[in-house]
Swiss-Prot record:
InterPro entries: Cation/H_exchanger_TM, CPA1_transporter
PANTHER family given in the database record: PTHR31102, SLC9B1-LIKE PROTEIN SLC9B1P1-RELATED (PTHR31102:SF5)
Record protein name field: Sodium/hydrogen exchanger 9B1
Main subcellular location: membrane
Amino acid sequence: MSEHDVESNKKDDGFQSSVTVEMSKDPDSFHEETVEPKPELKEPEPKEPEPKEPERKEPERKEPERKEPERKEPERKVPGRRETQTKETQTTEIERKETKKKRGTNSYCPPQGTINKTITDGAALIALWTLLWALIGQEVLPGGNLFGLVVIFYSAFLGGKILEFIKIPVVPPLPPLIGMLLAGFTIRNVPIIYEFVHIPTTWSSALRNTALTIILVRAGLGLDPQALKHLKGVCLRLSFGPCFLEACSAALFSHFIMNFPWQWGFLLGFVLGAVSPAVVVPNMLMLQENGYGVEKGIPTLLVAASSMDDIVAITGFNTFLSIVFSSGSVISNILSSLRDVLIGVLVGIVMGVFVQYFPSGDQERLTQRRAFLVLSMCISAVLGCQHIGLHGSGGLVTLVLSFMAAKRWAEEKVGIQKIVANTWNVFQPLLFGLVGTEVSVESLESKTIGMCLATLGLALSVRILSTFVLMSFANFRFKEKVFIALSWIPKATVQAVLGPLALETARVMAPHLEGYAKAVMTVAFLAILITAPNGALLIGILGPKILEQSEVTFPLKVELSNFHH
């Protein structure tokens, strides 16, 4: 229907209504007024509106809908931009095709994608290195401290990436930290490379303490009070029991096998007592996504307890570290360690209350400000406590501060966790690379390795057995208890921090105790190398076979799901 016909129809309607009204009033006036519109009625052919009148009555309201496409016709004319855009896209596609034709068979010149990104990053790195060389000088040249740090970082990073690319069918992926550890070990035991890699003790100590701080911050932010209340006794038994029993058994076995003093034995025990969330959490999340063990909450239990287990181990290590390197009596050492714990808790509460209200919620870039404030305050607390001799206080300050802040922020802490996780991604290659550089093949004797393996194996056996027994009081089947016990053996990050920390403290404060510290370092290295890949394989293989599979109707909300340390 054309616009002219529509207008004529409207006029017809108006004319008929006027006719009916005027007839009711005055028929004479009707005859007079009808004379004028008659020529207008004859213009649009009278035969067309008559059959269309019933159509007009029903879809009168639909006519404006039919007019919409008619109204869009001028809009199509106006936005010729779309036509120009389509023409531009066509021309760009034609240009791309022409460029591809010009390239011919040599389609990789200039390169695209990953190769292009790698070349770009390399050029930026060279430019940055040139700038640092102009500012610092010899530090960035081979043999300098910064040069060695960069070599270790990139070697460990590449080692982790290479291990990620190695995929074996039917076998779960291996943790990248093993590749980082082996990269540092390779640098240490290749004389040509290690000749140019020198890192001062103060640098490595500061880096390890910073990595430890990030671990504790992530642990504090990741603690979920609701999950802990829901799991209650089971989570507490799994967090405290195996760690304490493994520490005591390691102290006992190292005392009789390796001739360790009792203080050093307990220090070694708390180094070994921590489980690695870097191995446990990703594998638990994979099982959870497929519905394995979700009905009984096994993934939730292991994820929540892994963080608490690390906290117990680090606190025990700091306590015995202060006991080992102090010259007082046993009673005075115990009192000083309790003093450190009390100071750490009180300072952490005060700083945690401050962080809850500062910065306020009306500030810009609130997430970045909060993350920076928490990290800077925690790192300052750890390094400052180390400097003044309160070895057991810094970690507790960090833990209490981050936990109180997370409790106040609730769901807003997710963005802060992501920032802290990105910070950890930078320090992780440095940490494991530095651990690898501390282990020299020349200094290792077969007898020493045998004693370390014996102590490690016996302590792990006690841990597995104690975990199984402690889970007997929960509502788990026999196979599920076996799975939980075997899932509780991987060790990685905490051992990478605490093992070298004891060695560096011995070098600075008591060089005559360096032999014990090297033995602790060796046991920590072997624990990472043996338990991390084997633990990942056991979890990935036994999980689908042992745990019951159920339909996942909703995602499991666990705050520690981003915990990758």
